[in-house]
Amino acid sequence: MKKIIPALLFSLLLALSAAPADASIWTARETGDYYELIYPVFEGDDPDIKETINTDIYTRASRTADAGRRRYTTSFRYELMMENDRYLSFLFFPGGYEEGAMHGMYAGVGVVYDKTTGVRLPLSHFADVTVSDLVRLQRSGHFYRYNGTPIPVENIQGRPQKVPEDYFINDQGQIFVIFSPYILACFADGVTAIDVTSLGKPGVL
């Protein structure tokens, strides 16, 4: 599978396979022998910004497809966490299933784009976060499943060892750093999140 679809062909494929998800977001689906991709497509007035964002998204999705093989199927899906006039926040879920395994494995990847430039913004753009901050917040009731369900302190199975690059912003302007399954809690808790909104930089959001 090619890593990047040329811009014109990419647009034509999307026109045939996309379905609306939000005012400026479309959902595209691709399937192959060993993969299924469900990913967002950004629509905007500036073609360069649109291409920058969509190329980054598709590159991520295509890596998942390229990992698929006989007896190992892969998938890629997403959730739109927030969109406003300036920012676009997604959670991506690349995963794979080995034939015969008890369950598949997947990761949580959080990305925030600047809609005025197309640039993917680091966590440090919105908040200054340290490992000590994450441990403190996790232990003081700011630990959740990514969907907002609180995780009790007694269910914690690990402590943050580093500040992840992955994060998202929700519709309320809250900032969450995310961790893939098993890192901080059991597999059933899925992708977990620590609310770092209190560390946010004033006036950025």
Feature annotation, model-predicted:
Residues 7-8, 100:
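Composition-driven detection of intrinsically disordered, low-complexity segments
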Residues 8-15:
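Bacterial N-terminal signal peptides
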Residues 19-205:
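Compositionally biased intrinsically disordered regions enriched in Thr/Gly
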